């Protein structure tokens, strides 16, 4: 069995190639590596936290509740890596935190949260529709894109309503969502 401390040293070496090479070995250790990786998510060094999340993202033993707090990490790169990790571990328990993360000041993190919600799929639809009611435009765009990708008929009313928005981006995602639902017809205002 590889020495855990040596693998963690390589993971946090500051050398991306070396760090990436040890991830399969860490995963080969199974659940034995999890406590050390979780401890690493609390490091003062952003790079260490990022690599811990990167490793946890590919572990089949990662528990969603251990990732959720990392969506509030002070470093946007760690938050983005966490949203990506949650996309690899789709779970309904992450829906509220991911919807909140769609408001992240970092647009990549917000977009990755939307991608994770797409992976969760239909269980996220009701909360996404509710979010459309009062969210700022940037969040509504992400929500509409997410709804368009999920392709759930419950989103039809919000997609139709968004066709009348002034934002061309909202109109685009509304039209795309309707087309993906097989409702690709011309909509004319009376």
Predicted regions, residues:
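Phosphate- and divalent-cation-binding pockets in alpha/beta enzyme and binding domains
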Residues: 158
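TPR/TPR-like (Sel1-like) alpha-helical repeat modules
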Residues: 163-168
């Amino acid at each position: 069995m590889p020495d855990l401390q040596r693998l963690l040293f390589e993971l946090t070496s500051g050398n991306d190639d070396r760090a990436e090479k040890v991830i399969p070995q860490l995963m080969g250790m199974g659940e034995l590596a999890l406590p050390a990786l979780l401890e690493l998510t609390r490091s003062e060094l952003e790079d260490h936290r990022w690599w811990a999340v990167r490793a946890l993202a590919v572990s089949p033993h990662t528990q969603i509740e251990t990732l959720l707090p990392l969506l509030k990490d002070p470093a946007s790169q760690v938050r983005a890596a966490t949203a990506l990790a949650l996309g690899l571990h789709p779970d309904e328990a992450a829906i509220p935190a991911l919807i909140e993360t769609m408001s992240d000041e970092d647009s990549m993190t917000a977009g990755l949260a939307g991608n994770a919600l797409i992976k969760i799929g239909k269980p996220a639809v009701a909360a996404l529709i509710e979010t459309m009611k009062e969210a700022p435009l940037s969040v509504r765009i992400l929500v509409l894109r997410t709804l368009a990708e999920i392709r759930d008929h419950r989103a039809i009313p919000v997609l139709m309503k968004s066709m009348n928005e002034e934002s061309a981006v909202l109109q685009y995602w509304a039209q795309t969502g309707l087309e993906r639902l097989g409702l690709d017809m011309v909509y004319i205002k009376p």
